[in-house]
Amino acid sequence: MKTKNILFALIGILMIAALLVGCSGGGEEPAAEQPAGGEEASAPAEKPYIPVISKGFQHQFWQAVKTGAEQAAADYDVTITFEGPESEAMVDKQVEMFQTALDKNPAAICLAAVDSKAFEPLLQEAKEKGIPVIGFDSGVDSDVPVTTAATDNIAAAALAADKMAELIGGSGEVAIISHDQTSRTGIDRVKGFKDRIEEKYPDITIVDIQYGGGDQLKSTDLAKAIIQAHPDLKGFFGANEGSAIGVLNAVTELGMEGKIVVIGYDSGQQQMDAIRAGTEAGAITQNPIGIGYKCVEAAYKAYKGEELPPTIDTGFYWYDKDNIDDPEIQAVLYK
């Protein structure tokens, strides 16, 4: 037994000695290869990330904006995400999206706000973090955004009012269905149309203005109620795609085609078909692909520290059955 204990002790001493030799290595292990200058090799640089937060995605207009944003992302080699709430009335949902994007510390953020006043605290947070914010389509009541890529909606709606006055003979009752009274687009389009009528056409009366949230069914019901309440109505202005389609549905369902002049805003297959058929007199089209492209382009330039103008005017056009197939118009229409 004594001999066995001595043997175990010797084995233990030999194992400890082997471990000590292994730790010292008996010499230096070759160092990991490093680039010249002794600095560690860096991982490939990630592309700048720019979240694009839209007012929605349910209308073809927003899909066209997304197409433009994706084109700019490819041209400027940046990564984007494109999202928006299910409804253009969901302010809280969009605010949550902006907060989530901000928490990811992006290179810049593009925002089309559903409420021009709701984002001020988050905009200030973005400013403090040094994250540029670019407005698109619908701006905010704040000086934080570096620039806003959008249509001059007041001027565009004023043109719609001029066309309405011409088509109804300069007198009569008209009405407006708009998408909201909180976003800059909703506010400015109603203002542009209303102000032009009041300034230039004293014999035209705007008998009602209603807001359907851009929802076609709700806008249809509102338009039908207005038509029934005002049997002498001569004209209707739908201030975005959903509003215009709602007006068209109401006019058709009540058998008022040819009796009420319908002027819309934006495009989409249903409006284009109605214009070709004569149910809709014409519409204002924006340049949605251009809006999407310009907002991402501006975001990249702001991230790089380039100077930008306060606004980027993306343009607008009047189209009707006479020019709908012109190449210039076809380039800015979407289906």
Feature map (PLM): residue ranges:
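A residue-level marker of the well-folded mature domains of exported/periplasmic proteins
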Residues: 9, 22-335
